[in-house]
């Protein structure tokens, strides 16, 4: 894992699937924004900290997904790191049963099997309306960016660098993705649009870029959500069940996996888009003996 300078006292660690921002409080103490994936990033993150003589005094979590909170509890135990999280994400992170709220397609048993490493107890809670956080002797800006998850936040370093978590992804990720991860699509679109007024010397996207201009990426991320919703509608034949509809979409998009976690993410994401299409009046749900059937509107 490499350490790359971004701006001022802000750096990023180049983890396996994401960038982990690191803000230097001094030559030794640092604050991390997220911690990577337990299985893939723990040894690399530990080696990076040890080799550079860095002590993780604190971590601020953008949201409770396994590729972001995988090493929070580990850092708390090994280094005495303090962890802060937004109130919704902090609640989700307390144990595998709660963590399932972000992975609802998994059974409780499977959630307990998979997510023991990802769970942690936050040392402090970030309110849902907070715009700043006094932490480890510094003031960090807080951007409330719900949508990707219910309590997703961005963080602004004291030197002005904006970490946007998963609110935006880079163009390479868009080009490779089959279906966006978004819990509440309408809120996600609002959060993405709100970034048009944000000004910073650098912007860090967890997946997986550092940029100085967001304009094109905001447009392409919004277009990606709208494009995928249109493709989903194209796959809907009136009267389909959820199973029929997702099968048709995944067959068209060549989404194939036998990995239960990956499948659960696809199922969850698809279901979130279906809910949005219903909420926006483009799809109607009809129930017969408690079974849902979907119909296009107009």
Residue ranges and their predicted role:
Residues 1-52, 154-165:
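Conserved beta-strand hairpin/beta-sheet module of binuclear metal-dependent hydrolase folds
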Residues 37-132:
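Active-site HxH/HxHxD metal-binding segment of metal-dependent hydrolases
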Residues 31, 60, 83, 161-164, ...:
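Residue-level marker for buried hydrophobic side chains located in beta-strands
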Residues 37-38, 139-146, 150-226:
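Metallo-beta-lactamase
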Residues 19-22, 26-29, 40-43, 50, ...:
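A structural signal for the main folded, soluble domain(s) of proteins
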Residues 51-54, 135-138, 197-199:
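Glycine-rich phosphate-binding loop signature in dinucleotide/nucleotide-binding domains
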Residues 9, 23, 34, 63, ...:
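Divalent metal-coordination and catalytic microenvironments
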Residues 231-298:
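C-terminal regulatory/interaction regions
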């Amino acid at each position: 894992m490499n350490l790359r300078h971004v701006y001022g006292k802000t750096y990023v660690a180049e983890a396996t699937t994401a960038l982990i921002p690191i803000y230097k409080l001094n030559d030794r103490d640092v604050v991390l924004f997220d911690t990577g994936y337990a299985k893939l990033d723990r040894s690399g993150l530990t080696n990076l900290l040890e080799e550079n003589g860095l002590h993780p005094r604190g971590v601020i979590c953008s949201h409770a997904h396994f590729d972001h909170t995988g090493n929070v509890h580990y850092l708390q135990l090994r280094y005495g790191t303090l962890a802060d999280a937004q109130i919704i994400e902090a609640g989700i992170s307390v144990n595998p049963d709660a963590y399932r709220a972000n992975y609802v397609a998994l059974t409780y048993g499977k959630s307990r099997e998979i997510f023991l490493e990802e769970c942690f107890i936050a040392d402090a809670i970030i309110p849902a309306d907070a715009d700043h956080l006094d932490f480890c002797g510094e003031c960090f800006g807080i951007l409330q960016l719900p949508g990707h998850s219910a309590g997703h936040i961005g963080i602004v370093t004291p030197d002005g660098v904006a970490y946007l978590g998963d609110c935006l992804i880079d163009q390479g990720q868009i080009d490779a993705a089959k279906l966006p991860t978004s819990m509440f699509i309408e809120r996600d679109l609002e959060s993405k649009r709100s970034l048009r007024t944000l000004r910073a010397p650098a912007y860090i996207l967890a997946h997986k870029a550092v940029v100085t201009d967001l304009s094109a990426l905001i447009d392409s991320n919004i277009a990606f959500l709208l494009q995928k919703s249109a493709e989903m509608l194209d796959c809907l034949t009136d009267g389909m069940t959820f199973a029929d509809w997702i099968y048709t979409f995944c067959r068209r998009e060549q989404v194939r996996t036998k990995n239960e976690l990956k499948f659960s993410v696809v199922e969850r994401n698809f279901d979130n888009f279906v809910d949005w299409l219903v909420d926006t009046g483009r799809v109607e749900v009809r129930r017969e003996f408690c079974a849902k059937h979907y119909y296009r509107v107009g």
